Structures are given as structure tokens and as C-alpha cells.
From Swiss-Prot:
The keyword Nucleotide-binding does not apply. This is Sec-independent protein translocase protein TatA. Part of the twin-arginine translocation (Tat) system that transports large folded proteins containing a characteristic twin-arginine motif in their signal peptide across membranes. TatA could form the protein-conducting channel of the Tat system. PANTHER family: SEC-INDEPENDENT PROTEIN TRANSLOCASE PROTEIN TATA. Residues 41-75 are annotated as: Disordered. It comes from Xanthomonas campestris pv. campestris (strain ATCC 33913 / DSM 3586 / NCPPB 528 / LMG 568 / P 25). The Tat system comprises two distinct complexes: a TatABC complex, containing multiple copies of TatA, TatB and TatC subunits, and a separate TatA complex, containing only TatA subunits. Substrates initially bind to the TatABC complex, which probably triggers association of the separate TatA complex to form the active translocon. The chain crosses the membrane at residues 1-21. It is a single-pass membrane protein. Disulfide bonds: none annotated.
Amino acid sequence: MGSFSIWHWLIVLVIVLLVFGTKRLTSGAKDLGSAVKEFKKGMHDDDKPAGKLGDDSRSAEQAREAQAERDRDAR
């Protein structure tokens, strides 16, 4: 009586799907997955030497500049 059976969890799942819809749930799951991936990447970056960390930020800056140029060209 104290624990939930599989039927309780299935009913809760159906109610959640009806309330939020599948599109919002998949979007939320995708965002959660990318956040976990970024967190793991950040934890892995702690192991890199200080010289290597600067290289990633430079390539990120170049990517931002390239995206800004594409945005300007699109207008």
C-alpha cells in the first residue's frame, strides 16, 4: 500500500502528457540533455592545461564573429 505500482506511474505519465503535450516535453528533455552535456564538458575542461583553455575561447569568438557576419548578410 505504501509504494506506487506501475499503473499509478502510467496514469501520472498520461496526465503529464495531456497537460504539457509531447512537443514541450521533448523540447525540455532536449534542453536538459544539452545542459548535462555542457556540464560534463565543463568538468572535463578542468583537466586541461591553462594554455589549451584559451584556444577554445578563441575558436568560440571566431564562430561568433562568423555568425554575426552571416546575420548581417542575411538582412
